[in-house]
């Protein structure tokens, strides 16, 4: 019955590479493709599919691979850009408490006062106009941290 095999002159599928080593055909996921043998049913008509897991199989911890939230091995959290900016902004509560009172040896604490500008007619105009320059310099120093 050997003469009945390949009766339509279909090209033979070689199971070896160019050096004669045996090879296995695999699908796009790397799973081996079973060879077709006679005597088996067609899949879907009484056949059984012995497939494996076609998705990604992950092992290890479920934590993110990004280590940006923790410092290198110390266990302390790194400060994000938001926290660094809060420290640098002049209107910050901590910044105000540091800037309002200073001590000089022998003189006691000195307190800084906000100066108000007066208009030419003698009336109080309020605080000086706001300038964005200190905020911009704080942002640049925080980003280049």
From Swiss-Prot:
Biased composition (Basic residues): 47-57
Key word Repeat present: yes
GO annotation terms (biological process): cold acclimation; response to abscisic acid; response to water deprivation
Miscellaneous notes: This is a SET 5b protein.
Coiled coil: none
Function: LEA protein are late embryogenesis abundant in higher plant seed embryos. There are two subsets of LEA proteins (5a, and 5b), the first ones are expressed when the cotyledon weight reach 80 mg and the second set are expressed above 100 mg. The function of those proteins is not known.
Name of the protein this chain belongs to: Late embryogenesis abundant protein D-11
A GO MF term: metal ion binding
Compositional bias (Basic and acidic residues): 82-96
Keywords, comma-separated and alphabetical: Repeat
UniProt record similarity statement: Belongs to the plant dehydrin family.
PROSITE patterns recorded: DEHYDRIN_1, DEHYDRIN_2
Chain spans, region Disordered: 1-136
UniProt organism field: Gossypium hirsutum
Low complexity compositional bias, start-end: 58-68
Residues spanning the membrane: none
Higher taxonomy: Eukaryota, Viridiplantae, Streptophyta, Embryophyta, Tracheophyta
UniProt keyword annotation of Repeat present: yes
Compositionally biased intervals (Polar residues): 1-18, 97-107
Record-linked InterPro entries: Dehydrin (IPR000167), Dehydrin_CS (IPR030513)
């Amino acid at each position: 019955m050997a003469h009945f095999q390949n009766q339509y002159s279909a090209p033979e599928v070689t199971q070896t590479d160019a050096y004669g080593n045996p090879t296995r055909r695999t699908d796009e996921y790397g799973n081996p493709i079973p060879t077709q043998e006679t005597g088996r049913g067609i899949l879907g008509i009484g056949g059984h599919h012995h497939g494996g897991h076609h998705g990604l199989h992950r092992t290890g911890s479920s934590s993110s691979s990004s280590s940006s939230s923790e410092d290198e091995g110390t266990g302390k959290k790194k400060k994000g850009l938001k926290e660094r900016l809060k420290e640098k902004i002049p209107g910050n509560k901590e910044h105000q408490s540091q800037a309002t009172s200073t001590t000089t040896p022998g003189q006691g604490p000195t307190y800084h006062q906000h100066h108000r500008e007066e208009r030419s007619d003698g009336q109080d105009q309020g605080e000086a106009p706001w300038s964005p320059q200190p905020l911009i310099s704080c942002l640049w120093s925080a980003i280049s941290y």
